[in-house]
Amino acid sequence: MSWQTYVDDHLMCDIDGHRLTAAAIIGHDGSVWAQSSSFPQFKSDEVAAIMKDFDEPGSLAPTGLHLGSTKYMVIQGEPGAVIRGKKGSGGITVKKTSQALIIGIYDEPLTPGQCNMIVERLGDYLLEQGM
């Protein structure tokens, strides 16, 4: 299965008639493996800052998580495994696997819990597959 299929079928899936705003699978080095057409253009230093927070949990809290032109307030996650961010009525979930970052961006009416479930379910599956 291609990485794009994981994005299209698993991350951008339909939940009660709603879906994520954008999603991507990005390598730890910042390379894009696959992304939805709506995924924001991001900078490599933004991915580096996300990776640093997985190694040093809490490092993003003072500055926020930046992706594209959007700043998210970092909220509770799972140190070393999941980073969650909030901005207005939407937010972001980032799940780290051994080789990639699974990223989902949402806005109402999708809930934070639904975004977490979508992103973390795929991330957990990829971890089980050794990825």
From Swiss-Prot:
One of its GO terms (molecular function) is actin monomer binding. It comes from the Eukaryota. Belongs to the profilin family. This is Profilin-4. One of its GO terms (cellular component) is cytoskeleton. Occurs in many kinds of cells as a complex with monomeric actin in a 1:1 ratio. Binds to actin and affects the structure of the cytoskeleton. At high concentrations, profilin prevents the polymerization of actin, whereas it enhances it at low concentrations. By binding to PIP2, it inhibits the formation of IP3 and DG. It is found in: Cytoplasm, Cytoskeleton. Signal peptide: none annotated. Keywords: Actin-binding, Allergen, Cytoplasm, Cytoskeleton. SUPFAM superfamilies: Profilin (actin-binding protein) (SSF55770). It comes from Hevea brasiliensis (Para rubber tree). The keyword Cytoplasm applies.
